[in-house]
Structures are given as structure tokens and as C-alpha cells.
């Protein structure tokens, strides 16, 4: 009887020990951001949205005039004489070329977890929706019909194999994103210098 009690106590102790170890192993890293720890404040949304500003093109140097009539190059441009060929792969349709759109949809799937001032939340949502529209405009300009995605896709998502949506469908969604941005973004004098504002969205929509 005494031996059975000892075995029972030992079993309980082991169970408790393994349970404690499991709790320790389930901790999130303290020196980096993790998804369950991130979506907690309006500032988190602003931080995420600010990451999209790198999509915008930088200042153009004098080389931007190479294909204009501003000056003549010493060597003829290859595209003038049709010396360039169309690639059989790549060219803006690879996995990485859709990364920004997925990042936008990743945000859209999570931002509602945050509680706070609705106008500030909508401001960050407006920035993200502007950049989703930005990405899709250039996809349509390059390829014509493209698949419209507004959900976060995984490696095994069936939507990865969907066909292209028509330009009309895609531009309907683009305009919805831009209209949301126009409605919820501030005027230039109401935000920090360099931040997205409603007039930039209006200009892009036009």
C-alpha cells in the first residue's frame, strides 16, 4: 500500500513537471515581434502600415530621360530596334511579386483585433488599402486581367489556382480601396510630413 502511494506521488510530480516544461516552451520571444503579441494597440497598426511606404518609387535621376527626346544617347536603345525578347517566366508574376498584396491582406485579417479610437484605426486601414490598390493598378497595367485576392493565402490555399478576374472586377475593388482611403485619410496639414493623405489618394485615383 505504501509503495503504491509512493508511485502515485511520483506520477503526479512527473505530470506537474512536464506540464511546467510545456508552459515554458510555449513562451513567445521577448526580443522580437510575434503575431499573437503584436495586434494589441493602434500604434501597432500604424507601425505595420508604415512598412508599406518603401513600395513607393524614389526620386528619378537624369537617367529617367533616356527614353525621351530630351537628349540623345551615344548608343541606340535596344527596344527601338526590337532587340529585346519577352521572357518565358518571371516578369512580375513570381511568388515574391505578390508579397505586398499578401501583406496587405494579412493586415486586413487582423486589424479588427485592436480596440481603440476608430478614426485612428481607419487611418491605418486606409494606408494599407491605398497600397493594395497601388499594387493592383500596376499588376493590371502589366498583365491586363489578374486574380483579385482580399484574403490571406497559405501555401495550400485553393485560391492560388483560381483564374484571372476581369479588369472590371479588379478595378471595382481598386476603386473601393481608394475611396476608403480618400474618406479616412487626413489632409496634408493634419498628418506628419511624408505620410499618406487624402489628396495623394485622389491624385492616384484620377
Regions of interest found by a model, annotated:
Residues 129, 202-205:
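TPR/Sel1-like alpha-solenoid repeat signature
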Residues 21-63:
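Membrane-proximal, proline-rich intrinsically disordered regions
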Residues 28, 140-151:
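Short, well-structured active-site flanking segments
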Residues 31-34, 81-86, 151-158:
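Short linear capping/connector segments at secondary-structure termini
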Residues 60-77, 147, 195-197:
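Short, solvent-exposed turn/loop segments enriched in Gly/Ser/Thr/Pro and often Arg
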Residues 145, 192-203:
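Aromatic-lined, polymer-binding surfaces characteristic
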Residues 1-29:
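Bacterial Sec-dependent N-terminal signal peptides
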Residues 44-50, 54-58, 75-143, 159-172, ...:
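Conserved, well-structured interaction surfaces
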